[in-house]
């Protein structure tokens, strides 16, 4: 893949500060996963800004006998309840039976003396991950038909996932679906309160609106909690065929529209103001509009989507708070990365967008 075209390569050599003792890992995994008696080669997946993901290749890397993926939390202190490798392992050790697009997890290790953090090992799925730029496999953004398929597959696969019976997946006791959205809203309002650095009447008004207009949740389903196109892999020969869904560490049970709102918050229409990050290439010719995507989810899932604006606004509000949290760390001198110096403006833009989307 071409980095100059804005496309991140899939695999890189392990970053210097994210290396681990490969011999120790090889010794630990020997006889614990099939094929682990062969020589081990480790590379790192370039995508992802939180949990660290590595490719474990056993045998000749050109014709590997076995490939696995190792996942661990990011370096440094981790907030309680976040980057939960045990949770992700639990989900992936059983979900694949009911939802084959979830990779199968084989092993979990919470002995931090092995790697320095909990980790788990799962199967590798091969496919194309589409981030902010459409890769050349799918026409580089110029193929409207391929773009349409990409926009459809991310919606259709979400509806398929929400149709999974939690009990049949062995996850009927996951999370606490009762009062899920109320807890979510109060949690994010609290994060905003801790990250704000000056009065903001627009966000105050938006917060009241979110509290006063929260709709009644439909029946609970399994939730991914970070459903986006760049958390999926698609068949390189068919952009309309998903081969894997990634990043399950926040999976729980709750309101299915929370997933839709997260997805739609990242779904920018062509006439909307651009911000520094467009996590999905939804402005590309041929992509469904956000409204078309919402209606398609309603048809595919059989759910009434007439209250989806609330979830769209809340999803956009969450994006804004995330940027504000990063900005306040820069403002307080907790990070010196100058890329974060403008995130306060970007957060303000997203708060304005959230307010506008109340009537979208």
What do the PLM-derived regions correspond to, one by one?
Residues 39-222, 237-240:
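ATP-binding pocket architecture of kinase catalytic cores
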Residues 303-307, 321-360:
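Helical subdomain adjoining the active site within ATP-dependent kinase catalytic cores
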């Amino acid at each position: 893949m071409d980095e100059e075209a804005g496309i991140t390569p899939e695999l890189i050599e392990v970053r210097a500060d994210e290396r681990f003792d490969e011999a120790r890992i090889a010794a630990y995994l020997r006889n614990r996963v099939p094929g682990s008696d062969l020589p081990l080669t480790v590379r790192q997946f370039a995508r992802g800004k939180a949990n660290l993901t590595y490719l474990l290749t056993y045998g000749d890397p050109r014709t590997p006998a076995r490939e696995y993926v190792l996942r661990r939390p990011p370096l440094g202190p981790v907030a309680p309840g976040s980057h939960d490798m045990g949770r992700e392992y639990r989900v992936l050790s059983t979900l694949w039976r009911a939802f084959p697009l979830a990779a199968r997890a084989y092993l979990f290790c919470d002995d931090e003396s092995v790697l320095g953090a909990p980790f788990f090992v799962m199967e590798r799925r091969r496919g194309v991950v589409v981030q902010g730029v459409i890769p050349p496999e799918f026409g580089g953004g110029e193929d409207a038909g391929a773009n349409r398929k990409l926009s459809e597959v991310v919606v259709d696969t979400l509806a398929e996932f929400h149709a999974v019976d939690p009990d049949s997946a062995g996850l009927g006791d996951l999370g606490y679906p009762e009062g899920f959205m109320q807890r979510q809203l109060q949690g994010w309002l609290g994060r905003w309160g801790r990250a704000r650095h000056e009065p903001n009447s627009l966000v105050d008004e938006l917060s009241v609106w979110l509290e006063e207009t929260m709709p009644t949740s439909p029946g609970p389903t399994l939730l991914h909690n970070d459903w986006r196109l760049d958390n999926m892999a698609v068949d390189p020969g068919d952009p309309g065929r998903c081969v894997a869904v990634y990043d399950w560490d926040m999976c729980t049970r709750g309101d299915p529209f929370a997933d839709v709102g997260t997805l739609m918050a990242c779904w920018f229409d062509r006439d909307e103001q651009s911000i520094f990050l467009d996590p999905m290439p939804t402005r590309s010719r041929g992509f469904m509009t956000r409204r078309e995507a919402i209606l398609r989810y309603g048809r595919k899932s059989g759910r009434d989507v007439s209250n989806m604006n609330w979830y769209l606004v809340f999803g956009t509000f969450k994006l804004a708070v995330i940027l504000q949290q990063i900005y306040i760390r820069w403002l307080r001198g907790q990070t010196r990365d100058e890329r974060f110096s403008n995130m306060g403006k970007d957060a303000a833009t997203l708060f304005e967008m959230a307010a506008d989307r109340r009537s979208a």
